[in-house]
Swiss-Prot record:
Encoding gene per record: TRIM6
SMART domains: BBOX, PRY, RING, SPRY
GO cellular component: cytoplasm; cytosol; nucleus
Name listed for the protein in its UniProt record: Tripartite motif-containing protein 6
ZnF (B box-type) ranges: 92-133
Binding positions (Zn(2+)): 97, 100, 119, 125
Organism: Homo sapiens (Human)
The record's note on its domains: The B-box zinc finger and the linker region between the coiled coil and B30.2/SPRY domains contribute to higher order self-association.
Effect upon mutating residue 15 to A: Abolishes binding of polyubiquitin to IKBKE
EC number(s) reported in the record: 2.3.2.27
One protein family per Pfam: SPRY
Length: 488
């Protein structure tokens, strides 16, 4: 709070009669000074003695009215004191206490209120720290000026963010319409064939649009509310700073706390691009393959991995539905001699019937999967297989393998009895592959589940002399292969 020196000075320049700062001070012979209006005959009658000679209201020393003289030194001190505590050109206005009718001259620090001397002695304020309003006015004036500066900077930042969000909102809406038109144009060509698929795609886009707009609008609404609250707070502070001392200090604790701790909450990341762009399929073919995929998925079996067939290079998940390559633990030419590779078989054995399972190969740069004869199992190192062209024969049907695979991140191959292996063309790289075994028909088919179930390759018209097992080889890629339930 204000220095005790100001308190002492104020006491020296306070009129003993009206208890206010001296106004046009007059001094008498004893040295005491009073306001001109308080000590002259036209002032307060209670201080006027008898005609002619009068006595000092403080020490009762007699004096002649004609001996009253202006005290310019005190007048200058009072003027300077007012400038220190209130600012140049400002005057205290007398405001009366609503409860006691006395002048509001004190400020209660604990309650942040302006009170009178009777309030100070009441039970409500007993024991509280009180100060003269002149002492605290300048301090709060400076504090509010700092708060105003900070809050106006926040207001400018809020205005910039508002413009930014509106721009993003417009940009987001502009992205929606051309994409919507493109989807509708593609599907209108075959409206009667695949109307259901079109509506599904439009619904997905609409949901993404609504989600994006909701995020943007929530950020915009939050910013509007923050801006409104900020402006109300700024208006309150400006009103207090421009008003009287009473208006400045009344209920000051609340506004002080709000202004000091107010901080603009900035929005989180706003959507800028579609997560995925629509690819128009060959609708006639898509309808056919979708029906085919739906048919084979009805033969789904819950395949699990057999840990007893897993190589030391591999780690299986506890549920035995995921396998991951962790690096070779055997080096040198002994790999081939010990028939060492990185494959694992399924626990299920198939000697009849139709069976289907799906494998997630997303983000893998190399993999091999399909079926193999149960009497074979792992036979050689994949690293050697990738480097030695003649090793392809080890994965051919004549060797008991009906498999396809990925090499070098983009080469998809079917390992037929021909040499070299058959290079496959993929318009959409498969993140999930479906495997369908029809034992009696002698076929093993592979489906690109990622691309609506389009066929990848089919080994057909084979005679399976032995029981078959699902075959999985994550190769030397650390990304796992995972067995999935259809549509999961």
């Amino acid at each position: 709070m204000t220095s005790p020196v100001l308190v002492d000075i104020r006491e020296e320049v306070t009129c003993p009669i009206c208890l206010e700062l001296l106004t046009e001070p007059l001094s008498i012979d004893c040295g005491h000074s009073f306001c001109q209006a308080c000590i002259t005959p036209n002032g307060r009658e209670s201080v006027i003695g008898q005609e002619g000679e009068r006595s000092c209201p403080v020490c009762q020393t007699s004096y002649q009215p004609g001996n009253l003289r202006p005290n310019r030194h005190l007048a200058n001190i009072v003027r300077r004191l007012r400038e220190v505590v209130l600012g140049p050109g400002k005057q205290l206005k007398a405001v009366l206490c609503a409860d006691h009718g006395e002048k509001l001259q004190l400020f209660c620090q604990e309650d942040g209120k302006v009170i009178c001397w009777l309030c100070e002695r009441s039970q409500e304020h007993r024991g509280h720290h009180t100060f003269l309003v002149e002492e605290v006015a300048q301090e709060y004036q400076e504090k509010f000026q700092e708060s105003l500066k900070k809050l106006k900077n926040e207001e400018q930042e809020a205005e910039k963010l508002t413009a930014f969000i509106r721009e993003k909102k417009t940009s987001w809406k502009n992205q929606m319409e051309p994409e919507r038109c493109r989807i509708q144009t593609e599907f209108n060509q075959l409206r009667n064939i695949l109307d259901r698929v079109e509506q599904r795609e439009l619904k997905k886009l609409e949901q993404e649009e609504k989600k994006g707009l909701r995020i943007i609008e929530e950020a915009e609404n939050d910013l509007v509310h923050q801006t409104q609250s900020l402006r109300e707070l700024i208006s309150d502070l400006e009103r207090r700073c421009q008003g009287s001392t009473m208006e400045l200090l009344q209920d000051v604790s609340d506004v002080t706390e709000r202004s000091e701790f107010w901080t603009l909450r900035k929005p989180e990341a706003l959507p800028t691009k579609l997560r995925s762009m629509f690819r128009a399929p060959d609708l006639k073919r898509m309808l056919r393959v979708c029906r085919e995929l739906t048919d084979v998925q009805s033969y789904w079996v819950d395949v699990t991995l057999n840990p007893h067939t897993a190589n030391l290079n591999l780690v299986l998940a506890k549920n035995r539905r995921q396998v991951r390559f962790v690096g070779a633990k055997v080096s040198g030419p002994s790999c081939l001699e010990k028939h060492y590779d990185c494959s694992v078989l399924g626990s299920q054995h198939f000697s009849s019937g139709k069976h289907y399972w799906e494998v997630d190969v997303a983000k893998k740069t190399a993999w091999i999967l399909g079926v193999c004869s149960n009497s074979l199992g792992p036979t050689f190192s994949f690293n050697h297989f990738a480097q030695n062209h003649s090793a392809y024969s080890r994965y051919q049907p004549q060797s008991g393998y009906w498999v396809i695979g990925l090499q070098h991140n983009h080469e998809y191959r079917a390992y037929e009895d021909s040499s070299p292996s058959l290079l496959l063309s993929m318009t959409v790289p498969p993140r999930r592959v479906g495997v369908f075994l029809d034992y009696e028909a002698g076929t093993v088919s592979f489906y690109n589940v990622t691309n609506h179930g389009f066929p990848i390759y089919t080994f057909s018209k084979y005679y399976f002399p032995t029981t078959l097992c699902p075959y999985f080889n994550p190769c030397n890629c650390v990304i796992p292969m995972t067995l999935r339930r259809p549509s999961s």
